[in-house]
Amino acid sequence: MNVTTSFPILNLFGPKGSGKSELAHSLTSFFIPSYIAPNINNTTKAALAEAVAEVSNAIVHIDEYKNTLDIEKREFLKGLWDGAGRSRMNMDNDKKRETTAVDCGVILSGQEMPTADIALFSRLVFLTFSKTTFSDDEKRRYNELKLIEKRGLTHLTGELLKHRNQFRSNYRHMYDETAADFSVAFVGKIIEDRTFRNWVSITAAF
């Protein structure tokens, strides 16, 4: 965020039983054991903002997105990309407006691709899920994965943190280099600015 001022939201969408929520659970397990994702439809905007604001340098999962979602929550989701959470008046502090910070990655999942708001759409990177039937071997390996997650994965996150300083030192350079490479690769093609920045933000990390 210090480099880009924005961070793409990972969208997992597909039919029920395709494994999208389980992937999100696996990813959040690296930071928060036994994380329970809020259902965006029956969770208040204030509670959603609190769920995002209470963690830093981790991942928050918001589940059950639908295109019928009310406009206020869609606006809230768009703000997450910009690093801004809920905005409110603090009546105990001279009625000053306060905006909660967003210092984490966000996963948004649901059965529908978010097409109701093009501005939200451009803030997302997508993983599509379509498979809903699985072999016995796939089910066995899934159960093994869940057992590993139950034992805890945060020790692996600790190992990754050993490379934090190297990542921070090199990311700015790699971001600029990746943006330049993409500009050449896609010359003559029209790519929405947010989409371009999403691609660069992720690719620069590798």
Regions found by a protein language model. Give the residues of each.
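Phosphate-handling catalytic cores of nucleic-acid transaction enzymes
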Residues: 1-206
